[in-house]
Amino acid sequence: MTGVKWTFGIVAVAATLLAGVVVSSSGRAEVVQETPSTQSPVTKHTYPLDDAHYLRWALPKGEEAYGRLEGERLKRWVDTITAVSRKSRDDGNRFWGRIAGTKYDEMTEQIVEDAFRQFGLQNVRRQWFDLPPQRLPTAWSMTASGGGKTIELTTVQPARESAAAPHGGLELEPVWVGLGTESDFKGRDVKGKLVVIQSVPTPGAINNSAGWNGANMRASERGAAALLVSLAVPGNLQYQMWVRGGPIPSFSIGTDDLTSLRELMEKASNVKVKLQLDVEERSGLRDASVWGELPGTSDEDIIIMAHHDAYFEGALDNASGMSVMLGLAEYFSKIPQAQRRRTIKFVSTSGHHAGSLGTKWMSDNKATFLARTALMINCEHVSVTQTYPWGAQLRKSNQVDARRWWVFGSQRLAEVALDAYRTFGVAVYHEMEPNASGDMGHVSRDAPSIQMIESPNFYHSDHDRLEVVPAAGLEAVARAYAKIVDQVNRIDRKDLVPAPRGSN
């Protein structure tokens, strides 16, 4: 026991000394002024997080030709494209970005068309598609009141395809159901109320627990009048989510705002949430895929694609992919036609967030359009800062996030792709995806295809900005894809397609 007391005493004295306090013989605590000799030697240093300080793979010997694909040059395209989104915001649109069917979407198409013509591509054209009726939110708000206090929840964002609120809005009692599992709903009356769900990002807006554990539909089926979902991401990010909670007004909300609401619910009785959501259904909108071609020396082709519509600034999704596609168009435009075995078709595909009409058209016409396609490459979500949640912070690193990857084709094609990723330092997941996601998903099995894609914390959020798209990642992916095209052009198409099922 004496030893324990002695140890505690030492710890206590150490703690008081660290606090700049000592205990005198009279028992009173006295503040001791620190001198230069007693001050902590620790200085809070910072590591610059700009494009010059991200980890970067040195250009391997023998791969010097790909050095023309420079990250800083590619990133200028990201800035040019996201500027269109910023104009959409600055013009006063609440639902802003390069939204399919809007003039900002068409402005982006013009950037691509002008670039294709500048690079000398041939058969530059727009392929127009009529969009299905689009439900576009035009005005919304949410406040919570209780205990004499009212808070405005500024990060609420209507879910895509959400139902509108009744004229005059709704005033509802909020009910917290945690993750929204069957156990969370057990014994809770949510009928006619606002159901509040905390969702685990796995890793972000496109894939999260409220979707895959059925929480959203569970709320609707139990009679909820409205739905509010928050991704457990530190900070106060505003997300564009596909809540899919049935025919009720549905919203996402940032973590800090959710915390304010939860604390109000904990401290005050009879909390009420007022919400308003106006939605306009617009018909007659259209969108275009923008095409350009570099002729080869055979009747076969390679297709390199990237969709151009986006929510918010959409730097990762998908200005990053567009920049790589445009960089590859410029790179291969400088290769003489006699050295291009196959025609390379570049396309900025239309309406990804409105049904992926561009890639669906390719699939619908695969018997003719893809009959001689040796490879499709989808450039989507290709470079984003790797982050780590740490306490109440989302901490950035000086590394590019790993990507999910997909190959539909022969073992030889897979080896070509993975070797190129290793050569240029493109980090990928261990296992290949069981299915292609993104715009590639609609056409992925119609011809040999590859893609890398990642949809992390910043995806579909107002923090998907220029600064979270490292030039180093753009550069690595562009160089890898260029090398893959060169390698594939040395392989016959029959050796790129998947082996027949059941063959060895």
Task: List the model feature ranges, each with a label.
Residues N457-N504:
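His/Asp/Glu-rich mid-to-C-terminal helical/loop segments that flank catalytic regions of hydrolases
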Residues L69, R73, V78, T82-R89, ...:
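Sec/Tat-exported extracytoplasmic proteins
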Residues R76-D79, S88-L194, P201:
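Noncatalytic luminal/extracellular "stalk/propeptide" segments of secretory-pathway proteins
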Residues L258, T297-D299, T349-Q451:
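Metal-dependent peptidase/peptidase-like ectodomains
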Residues W77-T82, R125-R126, W176, L194-Q198, ...:
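Structural recognition of the beta-strand scaffold that forms the well-ordered cores
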